[in-house]
C-alpha cells in the first residue's frame, strides 16, 4: 500500500518488537521507509491520532480486550474515518460453520487464539469463529454506529466500521 500510495503515510503497530523490526527492514528494502512508521505498541496505548483508516488484520479475536482496542481505534480516527476489520470467515451459527475451513479455524482457535485472549487483560476470548453478528456487537460496544460487510473470501470476512 505504501508503494501504491506514496503521498500517504502508513503506521503499523504491534506489541511484538521483533515483528516491528522485521517490518522496518522490509519497508527499507521496498523503498517505502519515508512514508511508513512501525511502532511497538499495544492496540490500546498508541498515541497517534487523526487516521483516515485503521485496519485490524486478523487480530481482534486474539485480543484480551477487543472492545477496548476498538474503542481506542475509534478515538484515533479523524472525523469520517473508518475501521477495516478483517477476521476469519465464520457464520453466526454453528450449522453454518460445519465445513473444512471452519474445522481448521476452530482447532487453531482452541489451541492459540482463545488461550492468547484469556491470558490478557479482560480475556473476552472471541476466538477465530466469532462471526459477523458478534464482531458487530463488539464494535457497537466500542462506539461504532455501523458495521457492514464490505467483502468476503472463503477465509475472511471484511467489515467496514463507522463511528456513531
Predicted regions, residues:
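A short glycine-rich, Lys/Arg-flanked "PGG" loop and its adjoining helix->strand segment in the class I
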Residues: 67-79
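Class I SAM-dependent methyltransferase SAM/SAH-binding core
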Residues: 1-44
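A short acidic, Gly/Pro-enriched loop at the edge of an enzyme's catalytic core
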Residues: 41-54
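A short SAM/SAH-binding and catalytic strip from SAM-dependent methyltransferases
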Residues: 52-67
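Helix-to-beta-strand junctions that scaffold the AdoMet/dcAdoMet cofactor pocket
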Residues: 32, 63-64, 77-78
Amino acid at each position: 500500500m505504501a508503494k501504491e500510495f506514496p503521498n500517504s503515510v502508513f503506521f503499523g503497530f504491534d506489541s511484538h518488537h521483533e515483528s516491528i523490526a522485521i517490518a522496518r527492514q522490509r519497508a527499507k528494502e521496498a523503498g517505502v521507509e519515508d512514508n511508513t512508521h512501525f511502532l511497538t505498541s499495544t492496540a490500546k496505548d498508541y498515541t497517534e491520532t487523526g487516521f483516515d483508516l485503521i485496519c485490524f488484520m486478523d487480530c481482534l479475536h486474539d485480543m484480551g480486550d477487543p472492545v477496548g482496542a476498538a474503542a481506542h481505534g475509534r478515538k484515533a480516527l479523524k472525523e469520517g474515518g473508518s475501521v477495516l476489520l478483517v477476521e476469519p470467515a465464520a457464520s453466526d451459527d454453528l450449522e453454518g460453520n460445519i465445513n473444512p475451513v471452519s474445522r481448521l479455524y476452530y482447532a487453531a482457535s482452541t489451541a492459540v487464539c482463545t488461550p492468547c485472549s484469556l491470558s490478557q487483560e479482560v480475556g473476552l476470548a472471541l476466538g477465530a469463529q466469532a462471526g459477523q453478528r458478534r464482531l458487530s456487537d463488539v464494535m457497537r460496544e466500542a462506539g461504532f454506529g455501523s458495521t457492514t460487510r464490505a467483502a468476503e473470501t472463503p477465509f475472511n470476512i471484511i467489515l467496514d466500521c463507522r463511528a456513531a
